[in-house]
Amino acid sequence: MPLSYQHFRKLLLLDDEAGPLEDELPRLADEGLNRRVAEDLNLGNLNVSIPWTHKVGNFTGLYSSTVPVFNPEWQTPSFPHIHLQEDIINRCQQYVGPLTVNEKRRLKLIMPARFYPNLTKYLPLDKGIKPYYPEHAVNHYFKTRHYLHTLWKAGILYKRETTRSASFCGSPYSWEQELQHGRLVFQTSTRHGDESFCSQSSGILSRSPFGPCVRSQLKQSRLGLQPQQGSLAKGKSGQSGSIRARVHPTTLQSFGVEPSGSGHIDNGASSTSSCLLQSAVRKTAYSHLSTFKRQSSSGHAVELHNLPPNSARSQSERPIFPCWWLQFRNSKPCSDYCLSHIVNLLEDWGPCTEHGEHHIRIPRTPARVTGGVFLVDKNPHNTAESRLVVDFSQFSRGNYRVSWPKFAVPNLQSLTNLLSSNLSWLSLDVSAAFYHIPLHPAAMPHLLVGSSGLSRYVARLSSNSRIFNHQHGTLQNLHDSCSRNLYVSLLLLYKTFGRKLHLYSHPIILGFRKIPMGVGLSPFLLAQFTSAICSVVRRAFPHCLAFSYMDDVVLGAKSVQHLESLFTAVTNFLLSLGIHLNPNKTKRWGYSLNFMGYVIGCYGSLPQSHIIQKIKECFRKLPVNRPIDWKVCQRIVGLLGFAAPFTQCGYPALLPLYACIQSKQAFIFSPTYKAFLCQQYMNLYPVARQRPGLCQVFADATPTGWGLVMGHQRMRGTFVAPLPIHTAELLAACFARSRSGANILGTDNSVVLARKYTSFPWLLGCAANWILRGTSFVYVPSALNPADDPSRGRLGLYRPLLHLPFRPTTGRTSLYAVSPSVPSHLPDRVHFASPLHVAWKPP
């Protein structure tokens, strides 16, 4: 007869009328019983012949094709001009005094951030914008291009101008080497004023491996300046700039852009204005160097007198193609839907390309992309605005994947210990948090996005015309792309974008200037950044709590008035660092803080209501006695696992589901198991904060017996059959809790200490979780454990009781500078250390 739910509850000792714990609990560790219950609940039956169910409510398989919906009305969000101050460390120090080592290290990490992949795969430009919405291809193309353009205008992207130069908008940082009229302009690290140098575009910035005497001669040539020799001095009349003594070699070396192989910047300015010497003079300039070979960072030996001449390079770089868009103006319309009708709507279509306010030199960047982009809804609640998804998954896959750094994510207990209090809370919204953190230009060649231009994009979609590079723009295939669909789409888009259609129809390659969201490095850097900032804020305002996880920053203070003044001060401080806050999205929570999916109040933490709703919905739609695909089970476990700490039996209750996912088998919910889970999740108990205290109850066990010490009372008992040591220790802890009612227990077993009950027999894990809920454990070394003797059957020997203080931990939750505790209303009594305690040291 199948096990009824009532009987199952009784078995797990969840009801009060169970017999004495010492008899009942060890039975749950019995393998035979666990197996019989599993069979009764149909948990072990993994080989099913009925077809699997692949959808439960909203949950589909993990790699489900949930088709994103294209919205033709999408607005591109606006981005403020975000410029994080470069001297952020100094500004923080002015505000709060010297920073701790931790804070400094974290802030240096992001100023600028660097990215070193092992290998970068370059994809053709056609793959730049993903054909994610085949029905709305053209519309999606222009919306995505507009989004990229917006990011470039906001200073978040670089635009690749040539192989070795890029332009951007916004304020430059000192590590971005400016080119003006083809010259390098060096900003010194102190930023007193710009030093402008005349560059001879040698493009080699590797560390020079010579002795000091040659090195001083070379210093200028390494930066592309002429070595000062008699023969040259005559040749360089009227050249601007000279090296002043103020530029230290360290600042010159710190532009860590190290191109592999020789090359130079093709600077797009005419060669007269870039004050290049004649090649004859250049040969003399380098003749004294030709004996050396200089090693560049990638290990190629570079001969310095071998530089390609400027003119030949620029011709090979820029094929002279007429503009595809403007060509339609002079051609005869091929039909009613010819693009020439649209092109003739305007006299002035504006320039073919736009250039940024600043030009900088970059490492060699090919005309390729390294990741595709597409648009989706900004979030489930905001479908009016779009969000750009960048797929840089190549860096986290395959043999050359980058192993991203790990960082601490606060767990539930740490979070509750830290934030569960009677403070008033508000949360700040950092707008476009990722785009605050600047990336070094050396990362640009690895993080490229872009598009191949409208003509290629359309041709690729309508696959009847293959465009090869050499036919590009010839008249016979100019009209191949004309079609009714394209005509109608462009006519509608003309209303939105006007003459920008021309600009957006050109190919473009953009690299990231701020960290992109699609790379595993970014969340790590963001977490380091916000936690360091919060650490500074906590020290600046001792009686408040500031805490952050990623871009979610919360502030807590004793009273609402205190909180408001704190809010003003912190906002001004963050703005002075260049951090952009979104004032409309500041939320005031009162005494119960909503953070990371939890509601945290003085009683402890609970899941937010929308998660509880989702769980109810999930149980409503959960089919009984039907095999459910294990990928759907993954989704269900993800949802239930989040709320598991708030239930009686916790994670152990989900163990059968975990087992089926691990074996990649379908799972069948029996009515009893479903009713059990349902009941578990209908009554949620808050996770309370742990309080400091003294440990006075100790438990210990051997495979055959257990022992407890409660104050001066001692107890011992034996097991019917020998048990594995971890199981015995867990039973001893349960007995100690139920006998003494104490919520701080001393144990010498690391598995019990970790409160992970998922490795024990299933029924025992579930029961123990409920008995030990809210218990804190203190580690006692076996040699000092007072319960060691009773567990071995010796009640006569007394070990002195230890005074073991328990201090709740906040884990590694980014509290680098611990904020002083909020003062209670009564001042503590002053404690004078006795001179004996201080002065006397044991021999």
Swiss-Prot record:
Give GO terms: molecular function aspect only. DNA binding; DNA-directed DNA polymerase activity; metal ion binding; RNA-directed DNA polymerase activity; RNA-DNA hybrid ribonuclease activity
The question of whether DNA-binding is a record keyword is answered with: yes
Which UniProt keywords are given for this protein, alphabetically ordered? DNA replication, DNA-binding, DNA-directed DNA polymerase, Endonuclease, Host-virus interaction, Hydrolase, Inhibition of host innate immune response by virus, Inhibition of host RLR pathway by virus, Magnesium, Metal-binding, Multifunctional enzyme, Nuclease, Nucleotidyltransferase, RNA-directed DNA polymerase, Transferase, Viral immunoevasion
What this protein catalyses is:
DNA(n) + a 2'-deoxyribonucleoside 5'-triphosphate = DNA(n+1) + diphosphate; Endonucleolytic cleavage to 5'-phosphomonoester
Q: What is its EC number?
A: 2.7.7.7, 2.7.7.49, 3.1.26.4
Fetch the PROSITE patterns from UniProt: RT_POL
The yes or no answer to whether the keyword NAD is present is: no
Spell out the residues of the site Priming of reverse-transcription by covalently linking the first nucleotide of the (-)DNA: 63
Where is Mg(2+) annotated to bind? 429, 551-552
Question: Where are the stretches annotated Polymerase/reverse transcriptase domain (RT)?
Answer: 347-690
The domain-related comment in the record is: Terminal protein domain (TP) is hepadnavirus-specific. Spacer domain is highly variable and separates the TP and RT domains. Polymerase/reverse-transcriptase domain (RT) and ribonuclease H domain (RH) are similar to retrovirus reverse transcriptase/RNase H.
Q: PANTHER family attached here?
A: POL PROTEIN (PTHR33064), RIBONUCLEASE H (PTHR33064:SF37)
Q: According to its UniProt record, which protein family does this protein belong to?
A: Belongs to the hepadnaviridae P protein family.
Kindly give the HAMAP family that the UniProt entry links to this protein: HBV_DPOL
Its biological function?
Multifunctional enzyme that converts the viral RNA genome into dsDNA in viral cytoplasmic capsids. This enzyme displays a DNA polymerase activity that can copy either DNA or RNA templates, and a ribonuclease H (RNase H) activity that cleaves the RNA strand of RNA-DNA heteroduplexes in a partially processive 3'- to 5'-endonucleasic mode. Neo-synthesized pregenomic RNA (pgRNA) are encapsidated together with the P protein, and reverse-transcribed inside the nucleocapsid.
This protein's name: Protein P
